Every structure is written in structure tokens, then in C-alpha cells.
């Protein structure tokens, strides 16, 4: 303990040493000067409105492209800014016409134009913004301390007031405050002038994977407080060894304790005082509250107490501070992370602080929406990637219940992890310590924070070892993690990135590994993704040491932009100017939500596997309910059930009492009646809130499951014929199979079906054919694994016409066409069996040769381009949203009526979309109800779009294309598949889907039927 206190004292002295220098105007290039005259960080609290002068609104603004062009005397009171423009604060330059947005994944925003020369950033293209405004300060503020607060400045700020230099600060994701008492004149208009640099030495520590904007974000204001005031308050909750009774330790520092006393009072959520008040005198006071069996805080039950801290001088109350707090205990025992003694599961997500319109400027409403979306998706934890967030975010996490990994604003990814890493650069030691120390001090009091993170992707070295020791000294009550410490470095939790399912399984089985494994980033959700998410959670739920992880990431980061024709779209790297190389393109779009917080299709799979209630059939009419919650029973939900027979509703009901204790199980009776194996019987279960809860409304479905009740193998209807269809050579180079109401034409030249008309309705678009298909428009994960080139053989393989045979069997006309695949001796065979009503069975075969091994297939099936008039879609399969073989658990079997136009999901970059799996039958009709039904001998996959594969396919390389700017093709493009390769989600730059979800080259057979309606 003594060594810890000594270390803390030395570190704080080191950090304080850089705050008192006079300005040299080289601070923006000096990593050992992170501030001048900046006030020490304090825990977050909100002043009364009467004590605040907002700084938001329009300011005089000057912008220059390079740092050596900046005005140097603009802060003077006699300076004339007539030629200046206007800029609102908060506001970002690039979103207001000053410079262009830049998105970079790993590497600095000057990459490709300037070399990395830390600590000095480039001068060229280092934009500088200068601001001026006169602010009226209330006369009644005279005799009080006046402080200016900048919520978030990117990247650094120089400040003047009334023509005098005040101070300097860097660290773009923590507020900076300066004492203006000596500079302001209450009752008068005061000139506030400041200058912001796009880049400074601190930018080398801010190489996060997001859009790089410049300017001011968050709240900016001037506030006042008494000259005698409380400087800071820190609150540490704890529970006893049995996790029953609680202690709350409160430390407070006072600016001038002479003739003053500090009073502390603790209240529950109903406003009742729960412990004796504490009164103390001194510059540093400690209060302790002992509460018998307090209501504990957890993400499931975020119960908050209110702590009031008041400063008195005699009987006069000088200042009152209010804090929300919660009783909870975080610890690591053995290989387990515990909250309140329970081995919780981290159902987490990474969240960047980004809005498609405001960039770093987020409204309170947007933050509340983000919380609501997380709750809707059963997310219980969030990592503040990769910097501290707006203070309101922590308040919301406390209030609504989210476990938080709070991360410091350090990422130097662009310097690599080797000898050049800034983690080994002694010049940057102080900055590493400063950013971690201020981060912890500012956010210390939030019960939602259960883990501190020292930074992200910034190498490993002495700076992080010192930062770990500093944070441990500041806060012994929480674990600390850092991904680049890997396993053997200073990290309490092993928190890798993008470890595969197999890796986590091996880690769990390794007796030498004793730390809990919680991935700080996993299940990379770029584009059409999240395949294999089930396999992660099958392991997490069953194996020791595995406790979950944080999906990368929450929302696509593209911003609203307009093209030259005024059309709005979601923009990403490469969209903004010619010098924007766009190498990272849409790598900013990895969200389970879209930029406007709409659910991407893969969000539903996350929602499903993150749910807390699970069901299993234990006997006919008996379902066991498992409550995966750790702290709450199920008294807040009711169970609604539906019985389906072959997709049709047969019965339904509600069970109001399904209460199960935390981590408990209970069997309930569901009176759905008798079922047999002559049909497919399914039981749908939905657990719904019986009242409003937080941001979720009454009746919201918090968990759902579908249980198969019968053993039924779906097969297609047999094809029968009362008479043999006719066959004739209708014109040159084609022959026709016909009956009383249909004609089907085949080409003699290549055997392809070129017309299929029944009752005047054409299945095929004019000039099109039914053709074998092995390709899909590559997904972002496909591009990441280079599948678009490795599997390019199957994009448009040349099928060399080999043979055609025709015969009749059982009154069916049988046409068999065989093709050789150019470049191999593999063959494709298409067999058509046609009855007297124009219905047919189709058998597609892939027959491998012996001469060479071919790459995996994206899919095995057929493509049927239909006239665009076919718009209505009905199917019995998995829906309602798109699904794939490795992302289908959240999509329940049922009958779904939709339109073809609804099938296309506008991923930020166009790609494969619209698939449905486990289809029993599929019907496509026009407005008259005329059309066709498709079945197969076993459940199949299909998609129906008004886009061809070619329209959605970028080719061998990605291009800057956008779904909003695509034009529909004049087609209804039907893809029927025996199977399609899965999507994967391990990462989006190298990994394929899991082996069981691939289609290795080999022998395949797809047998399906087409029937006119």
C-alpha cells in the first residue's frame, strides 16, 4: 500500500509539472507539454443552469489550410474580423465546408503525403481554425470563480480572453477547463478567442479507426462556483464477503477548508435517507456509509442511490453537488470476472461516438436512441472505443444498465507495434500517463464502469506498464485491461481481438491459461456478416474462462453526403476528393446497425444469441424455461405461444406466470394439444415485457425461440402426367415441348431453355435462359478473404455444350443437356422432366473430373431471370429478414408474404443480399396472381431481387459504389440454390466462413420443381 501511494504521488507530480509553463507556441509539437494552466481533472457533475453561460451558437471563424498560414494576432481586442465567416459550436469543420472528411482505419490522416515524424505533425494541410466572440458575463458572478469548459477539442486549443493568453490543452476526447477569474469582467462583454489545430503531437496518440474530423464537439460553456468550493469527489462502492451488505466510501477535496465543513447524505431512489449523514472538516475529507443489504446495481437491475455533498460556511450552504451511485463489487477470482459475486456473461458491443450528420457532435436524443437500441438487442455491455465518451453517455449507462469497459484516448496504430511504437518512446511517457490519469479521475464515480482499458492498438512497452500501475493506484476496485499486453503483459483480463471459435476453445482447455478471456473486439460485422456467431456463443455458454466479448461494432460510420446530382447517400473513404486515396473504403461500416441506427439484418442474430431466456422441450406439452439472468427473476415477462402446422397458425395462448429465479429452471405446461409426424409442427415462444421498462415499451419481445415438435421431412410433390407432352422442331435451331396450355422452347445450339410460357405467362424474361449458377456478388468478408479472386473460376465459367438427349418416361418429356466446364474436365448436367400441364422437375448435377482440383463454390444452384412484373413473393421458409446457412437462428420458419422490392437490403456497399434458407416452397406472382411455385426434394435457399448478380458485383476490386445510387435492373432475378456458402464473421480481412459452412468443390445434385399457378 505504501509503495502504491508513493507511485501515485510521483506520477501525479510528474503530470502536474507540465501545467504551469508560459506559452511558447511550440506546445502543439511537444509531447511533454500536454497543457498550460489547464485545471486538474475532476469527476463529472453538472452545475445549475443559473451558474452557466452557454458558448454554443455562431462564432466569427477563420480557417486556413496550413498551420504556417494561421493568424497570429487575432486574439487582440482591436482585431477586426470583418472578412471572417461564421461557424457554429459545437461543430466540425469538414462537415461545414472547411476541408474534406477523412476516414482511415490504421494510419494517420496524412498517410501517403507526409512521413510520420513524431512528435512533429505536418505543417502542410494542418488546418487551423480561429474563433472569436464577445460573451456577456452576469454581473452577479463577481466575487466567484469563473471557469471555461470545452467538452471536446480536436486536436488542441490555445485560449485567450480579453486579449490575454489563458492556456493550452490537448487530448481531443476529454474536456479541458481553465480558470478565467482573473480574465473576465462580470457585467460586461468579454472577448473569448481561441485557435484549434487539426493535428498536434497528440494526434500521434489518436490514430483510431474512424472518421478524422476537426473542431469542437460536446458541450462548451462558462460556469461559476464559490471561491470556497469542493474541488472533487470520488465514490467507491463495495460489498462484504457475502455480497450482502454495502459500504460507500466518499473522498472529497476542498479548495479552502477554513471555516467550512462538508456534509454528505445518501438517499435511495425513492428519496429516503438510508444512512446517517457524514460531517467532516479539512481539505481532504473521507465519508463512509454502511448500508444493510442495499439494492445492488447491475446491468440487469441498475438501481441508483443519490449522494448529496454540500459545503457549508457556518449555516450557509455554499455549494451542493449531486451524484448518482450504485452498490456493486467487481473482482476477478480464479479465471472469472465477477460482478456482485456472479460470473456474468459479457454480451457486448464496441461503440464509436459518431453521427451521420454531426460527426462527433451527438445530441442527447441520439445517445438515448443508442441505449434503446442496445437494450432492444439484449446488449448488456459497451466498450467506449477508443476514447472517453460524452459524460451523458456514462450517465445513461448508469441509469439504464450497461456494463462498460471505459477506454483511454490512446491509439498509435500507425506507428506499428515494433521498435517505433510510442509505447517505448520516453518522450510520450507523460502523455500516456496524463490521458489515463485524467480519464480515471473524470469517470471514477460511474457504477456502470466495471473495467478500465489503457488504450487500443498502441503497442506495448514501459509507458503502458507505468499506466497500468498508475490506474491501479488510482483505483484498486476495478480490473484493468489492455489488448496489446496480450496474455503475459500487464492486463487483468486476456482481451484479444478476433480470436476464432477454435482458438477460444483451445484457450479454455489450456490449464496454463488462468485469466478470463473476454474479446475486446470480435464478430466483425462488416456488410452482410455475422455468420458463425452461434458457434461463438455455443462455446461461451459451455466452456470455462470464456465470458463473452464486444462485437465490432455498433453502427456503420458512414456519413450523409450528396453526389453532384444532389442525391443523398452514405459516404465512405474515397468519396470526398481526388487526393483521398480511399484505400480503406467502406471499412468504416462494420455495424450491426446502419448509420441512422436502423437494424442491419445481422442485428437480429445478435439479438437472438444475446437474449437471457431459453426454452427446451422436455416432454409433449412441457417446456423448460432457463433464466440466464444473474440478478433478476422473470416476474417482469409473460410467455406468448403459437402452434404452427406447416406454417399455418393452429392455436395460441399466453402464460402470465413464468417466473423463474436467476440462473434457475422451471417446467411449464403449454396446452397446444396433440401433434403427429404427418406434418411439420412448430412451437413459437415469445417472452414479452408486461410493463414499460426503461426505454423498452410494454409487450416488447425480450426473448423468443422456435421449437420443432414433430419429426417431419419435407419433400416436394411428385410430378404426374396424364398425357405425354408434344415435342416438335418449331423454328431453326430450337425445339418446343408443348401441351394444351404451355410451350417450352429449347435451343438446339446449346441446349438451354429459352422460353417457358404457361397460359400466356412467361417465366423467363425475353432473351434469358435458366442457367447453372455458382456465384454471388462478393460480400465484404468475401473481399477480405480474397474469395472474389480465389474463387473467380466460378464467376462465369464457360459451359461448353457437349450433348443433348430427349426421351419420354412415365408420360413425361425428359430433356438432358450436358456441358463441360472449360478449363477442366468437370461437367454440369441439366435434366428437365416436363408433364402435360407445363410443370417440370429440374435436376442439376455438378460432376467432378479427375484432372484438377477446383476452388470452393459460392453457391450451387440456378439463375432464372424473370420479367420484372413478377413482384409478389410468398414462401414457407426462414424469415422474415434475410438469412444464410451460418446466420439463420433468429429467422424462424413460417409462411411469409413479401414483395420482391423488399428483398434488397441496402448495405453501404452493394453486395450479396436477400437470401432465405430452409425454404419448403416458394411462389412468385404478378399483380394478376399469375406465376410459378418452386419446391425441392429437400429444403433449399433462394433469393429474388430486381438486381442481377452483375449489378451488385464489384469485380476483382472494390469500387466506391453505394446502394442508394444503384438503379434496379429490368428483371426479377430468381436464384434457387441447393446451398450457398456462409458469411463468416471472424474478421473481414482474411478469414473464410467455418469449414462446415463452405461448399468445397465436389459432386452436387439439386433436384427441384417448377409449377405454374
Describe the predicted segments one by one.
Residues 23-47, 89-92, 201-204, 210, ...:
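Extended substrate-binding grooves/exosites of carbohydrate-active enzymes
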Residues 23-149, 200, 204-208, 213-216, ...:
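Extended carbohydrate-recognition surfaces in non-catalytic/accessory domains of CAZymes
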Residues 24, 100, 107-121, 170-172, ...:
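An acidic-aromatic loop/edge-strand motif
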Residues 24-34, 42-46, 166-167, 186-224, ...:
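Glycine/proline-rich low-complexity spacer/linker segments in large multi-domain proteins
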Residues 27-30, 40, 62-64, 92, ...:
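Accessory beta-strand-rich segments of carbohydrate-active enzymes
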Residues 95, 104, 152, 198, ...:
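Beta-strand/loop-rich accessory regions of lumenal/periplasmic or secreted enzymes
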Residues 185-187, 251-331, 676-677, 681-723:
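Extended acidic/polar, glycine-enriched regions
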Residues 278-293, 647-678:
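Intrinsically disordered, low-complexity Pro/Gly/Ser/Thr-rich segments with frequent PxxP/GP/PP motifs
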Amino acid at each position: 500500500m505504501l509503495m502504491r501511494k508513493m507511485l501515485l504521488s510521483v506520477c501525479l507530480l510528474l503530470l502536474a509539472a507540465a501545467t504551469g509553463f508560459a506559452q511558447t507556441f511550440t506546445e502543439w509539437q511537444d509531447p511533454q507539454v500536454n497543457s498550460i494552466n489547464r485545471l486538474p481533472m475532476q469527476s463529472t457533475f453538472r452545475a445549475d443552469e443559473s451558474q452557466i453561460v452557454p458558448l454554443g451558437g455562431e462564432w466569427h471563424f477563420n480557417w486556413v489550410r496550413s498551420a504556417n498560414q494561421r493568424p497570429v494576432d487575432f486574439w487582440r481586442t482591436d482585431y477586426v474580423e470583418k472578412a471572417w465567416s461564421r461557424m457554429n459550436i459545437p461543430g466540425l469543420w469538414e462537415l461545414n465546408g472547411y476541408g474534406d472528411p477523412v476516414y482511415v482505419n490504421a494510419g494517420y490522416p496524412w498517410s501517403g503525403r507526409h512521413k510520420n515524424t513524431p512528435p512533429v505533425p505536418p505543417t502542410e494541410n494542418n488546418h487551423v481554425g480561429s474563433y472569436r466572440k464577445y460573451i456577456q458575463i452576469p454581473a452577479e458572478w463577481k466575487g466567484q470563480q469563473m471557469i471555461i469548459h470545452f467538452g471536446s477539442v480536436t486536436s488542441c486549443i490555445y485560449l485567450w480572453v480579453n486579449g490575454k493568453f489563458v492556456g493550452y490543452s490537448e487530448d481531443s476526447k476529454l474536456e479541458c477547463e481553465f480558470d478565467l477569474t482573473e480574465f473576465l469582467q462580470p457585467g460586461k462583454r468579454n472577448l473569448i478567442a481561441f485557435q484549434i489545430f487539426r493535428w498536434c503531437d497528440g494526434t500521434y496518440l489518436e490514430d483510431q479507426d474512424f472518421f478524422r474530423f476537426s473542431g469542437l464537439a460536446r458541450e462548451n460553456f462558462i460556469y461559476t462556483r464559490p471561491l470556497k468550493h469542493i474541488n472533487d469527489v470520488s465514490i467507491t462502492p463495495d460489498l462484504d464477503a457475502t455480497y450482502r451488505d454495502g459500504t460507500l466510501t466518499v473522498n472529497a477535496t476542498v479548495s479552502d477548508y477554513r471555516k467550512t465543513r462538508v456534509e454528505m447524505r445518501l438517499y435511495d431512489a425513492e428519496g429516503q435517507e438510508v444512512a446517517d449523514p457524514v460531517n467532516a472538516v479539512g481539505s481532504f475529507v473521507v465519508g463512509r456509509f454502511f448500508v444493510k443489504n442495499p439494492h445492488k446495481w447491475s446491468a440487469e437491475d441498475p438501481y441508483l442511490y443519490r449522494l448529496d455533498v454540500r459545503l457549508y460556511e457556518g449555516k450557509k450552504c455554499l455549494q451542493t453537488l449531486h451524484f448518482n451511485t450504485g452498490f456493486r463489487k467487481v473482482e476477478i477470482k480464479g479465471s472469472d470476472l465477477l460482478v456482485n459475486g456472479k460470473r456474468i456473461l459479457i454480451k457486448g458491443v464496441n461503440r464509436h461516438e459518431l453521427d451521420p450528420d454531426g460527426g462527433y457532435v451527438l445530441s442527447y436524443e441520439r445517445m438515448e436512441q443508442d441505449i434503446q437500441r442496445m437494450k432492444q438487442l439484449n446488449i448488456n455491455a459497451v466498450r467506449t472505443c477508443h476514447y472517453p465518451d460524452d459524460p451523458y453517455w456514462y450517465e445513461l449507462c448508469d441509469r439504464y444498465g450497461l456494463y462498460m469497459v471505459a477506454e483511454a484516448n490512446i491509439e498509435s496504430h500507425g506507428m506499428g507495434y515494433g521498435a517505433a511504437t510510442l509505447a517505448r518512446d520516453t518522450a510520450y511517457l507523460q502523455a500516456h500517463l496524463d490521458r489515463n490519469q485524467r480519464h480515471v479521475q473524470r469517470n471514477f464515480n460511474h457504477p456502470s464502469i466495471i473495467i478500465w482499458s489503457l488504450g487500443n492498438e498502441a503497442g506495448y512497452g514501459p509507458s503502458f506498464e507505468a499506466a497500468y500501475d498508475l490506474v491501479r493506484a488510482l483505483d484498486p476496485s476495478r480490473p484493468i485491461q489492455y489488448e496489446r499486453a496480450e496474455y503475459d503483459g500487464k492486463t487483468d483480463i486476456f482481451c484479444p481481438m478476433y480470436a476464432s471459435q477454435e482458438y477460444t476453445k483451445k484457450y479454455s482447455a489450456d490449464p496454463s491459461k488462468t485469466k478470463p478471456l473476454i474479446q475486446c473486439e470480435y464478430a466483425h460485422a462488416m456488410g452482410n456478416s455475422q455468420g458463425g456467431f452461434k458457434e461463438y456463443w455455443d462455446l461461451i455458454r459451455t466452456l470455462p474462462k470464456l465470458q463473452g466479448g464486444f462485437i465490432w461494432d455498433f453502427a456503420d460510420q458512414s456519413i450523409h453526403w450528396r453526389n453532384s446530382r444532389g442525391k443523398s447517400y452514405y459516404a465512405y473513404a474515397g468519396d470526398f476528393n481526388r487526393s483521398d486515396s480511399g484505400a480503406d473504403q467502406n471499412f468504416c461500416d462494420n455495424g450491426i446497425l446502419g448509420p441512422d441506427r436502423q437494424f442491419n439484418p445481422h442485428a437480429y442474430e445478435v439479438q437472438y444469441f444475446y437474449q437471457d431466456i431459453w426454452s427446451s422441450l422436455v416432454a409433449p406439452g412441457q417446456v423448460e424455461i432457463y433464466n440466464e439472468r444473474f440478478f433478476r427473476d422473470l416476474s417482469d415477462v409473460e410467455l406468448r405461444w403459437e402452434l404452427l402446422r406447416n406454417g399455418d397458425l393452429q392455436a395460441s395462448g399466453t402464460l402470465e406466470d413464468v417466473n423463474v429465479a436467476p440462473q434457475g429452471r422451471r417446467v411449464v405446461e403449454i396446452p397446444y394439444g396433440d401433434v403427429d409426424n404427418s406434418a411439420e409442427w412448430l412451437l413459437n415462444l415469445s417472452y414479452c415485457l408486461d410493463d414499460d421498462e426503461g426505454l423498452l415499451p410494454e409487450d416488447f419481445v425480450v426473448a423468443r425461440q422456435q421449437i420443432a415438435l414433430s419429426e417431419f421431412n419435407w419433400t416436394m410433390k411428385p410430378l404426374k402426367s396424364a398425357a405425354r407432352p408434344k415435342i416438335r422442331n418449331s423454328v431453326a435451331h430450337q425445339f418446343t415441348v408443348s401441351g394444351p396450355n404451355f410451350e417450352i422452347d429449347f435451343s438446339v445450339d446449346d441446349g438451354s431453355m429459352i422460353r417457358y410460357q404457361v397460359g400466356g405467362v412467361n417465366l423467363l424474361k425475353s432473351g434469358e435462359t435458366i442457367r447453372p449458377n455458382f456465384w454471388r456478388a462478393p460480400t465484404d468478408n468475401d473481399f477480405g478473404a480474397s474469395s472474389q479472386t480465389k474463387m473467380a473460376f466460378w464467376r462465369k465459367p464457360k459451359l461448353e455444350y457437349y450433348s443433348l438427349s430427349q426421351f419420354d418416361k412415365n408420360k413425361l418429356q425428359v430433356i438432358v443437356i450436358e456441358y463441360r466446364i472449360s478449363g477442366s474436365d468437370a461437367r454440369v448436367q441439366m435434366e428437365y422432366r416436363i408433364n402435360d400441364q407445363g410443370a417440370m422437375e429440374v435436376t442439376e448435377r455438378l460432376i467432378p473430373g479427375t484432372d484438377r482440383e477446383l476452388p470452393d463454390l459460392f453457391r450451387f444452384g440456378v439463375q432464372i431471370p424473370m420479367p420484372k412484373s413478377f413482384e409478389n413473393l410468398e414462401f414457407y421458409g426462414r424469415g422474415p429478414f434475410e438469412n444464410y446457412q451460418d446466420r439463420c437462428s433468429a429467422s424462424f420458419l413460417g409462411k411469409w408474404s413479401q414483395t420482391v422490392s423488399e428483398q434488397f437490403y441496402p448495405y453501404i456497399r452493394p453486395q450479396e443480399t436477400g437470401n432465405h434458407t430452409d425454404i419448403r416452397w416458394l411462389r412468385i406472382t404478378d399483380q394478376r396472381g399469375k406465376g410459378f411455385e418452386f419446391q425441392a426434394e429437400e429444403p433449399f435457399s433462394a433469393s429474388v431481387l430486381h438486381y442481377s448478380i452483375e449489378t451488385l458485383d464489384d469485380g476483382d476490386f472494390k469500387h466506391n459504389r453505394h446502394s442508394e445510387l444503384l438503379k434496379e435492373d429490368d428483371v426479377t432475378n430468381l436464384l434457387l440454390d441447393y446451398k450457398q456458402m456462409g458469411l463468416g464473421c471472424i474478421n473481414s480481412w482474411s478469414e473464410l466462413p467455418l469449414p462446415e459452412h463452405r461448399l468445397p468443390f465436389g459432386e452436387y445434385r439439386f433436384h427441384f420443381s417448377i409449377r405454374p399457378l
